[in-house]
Design a protein with these regions (language model features):
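A cross-domain feature marking catalytic cores of carbohydrate-active enzymes
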Residues: 37, 68, 156
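A solvent-exposed, acidic/Ser-Thr-rich amphipathic alpha-helical stretch
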Residues: 58, 62-117
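Bacterial N-terminal signal peptides that target proteins for export
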Residues: 1-11
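A beta-strand edge to alpha-helix "cap/lid" segment located at domain peripheries
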Residues: 26-32, 100-190
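Hydrophobic pocket/interface hotspot
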Residues: 40, 55-56, 64, 88, ...
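Short, low-complexity N-terminal intrinsically disordered segments enriched in polar/charged residues
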Residues: 21-62, 175-190
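Bacterial N-terminal signal peptides
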Residues: 10-20
Length: 190
């Protein structure tokens, strides 16, 4: 009889432990998701020229990867020199320091924030005015970031690069052929 009671007690204890494990895992995952989102949002809240270097040092891992607009496009880099893949906290801060020389930020609105463990996705829109030619454009944006141990290890920022690069255009046109069956057409500055 004692063996049956001991066996029953062991089964009851095991059942309780197994019931708690998913709840603990879920709360750990939720806590990690919230912490990851908080790191990215803190960085975005501190991108002003007088704050961004300290924020990047504090919130980006030493070997973090920043992908801005594309992996590597030499032609676009001539227009937007921060584009491509760069490494370390300086990649995060130098981008925002350069942007202020090119555009006046008229609006930057986050509309959606999603986090799952170390992954964070941010969506929104911004309106910039080019400093040199006074062209205004509005673009959607998206961010995918990864956060480990309280530091961003990966940050990819995407926007409408046609609109952003066009905000500097003063003249010129392209003749474009988009598909084999389409007639060529011209895209020109307004």
């Amino acid at each position: 009889m004692n063996k049956i009671k001991s066996l029953f007690a062991a089964i009851t204890l095991a059942t309780c432990i197994l019931a708690v494990i998913p709840a603990v895992a879920q709360s750990t995952s939720e806590a990690q998701s919230a912490a990851s989102l908080a790191v990215v949002m803190e960085f975005l809240a501190n991108t002003a020229p007088d704050k961004v270097e300290a924020a990047a040092e504090r919130l980006a891992a030493p070997d973090a990867t920043y992908v801005s607009l594309n992996f590597d496009n030499p032609e676009l880099r001539k227009i937007l020199p921060w584009t491509g893949t760069n490494k370390g906290p300086k990649a995060f801060s130098s981008l925002f320091l350069q942007v202020q020389d090119y555009w006046k930020i008229e609006d930057f609105t986050v509309s959606t924030k999603i986090s799952s463990g170390e992954d964070v996705a941010i969506f929104g829109k911004f309106t910039y005015r080019s400093v040199a030619v006074d062209q205004v454009f509005t673009s959607p944006f998206s961010i995918h970031a990864k956060v480990r141990d309280g530091k961003m290890t990966y940050f990819q920022f995407m926007e409408d690069t046609y609109a952003s690069a066009s905000s500097f255009r003063q003249s010129g046109s392209w003749t474009v052929k988009t598909s084999a069956n389409a007639a060529p057409f011209t895209v020109a500055a307004d």
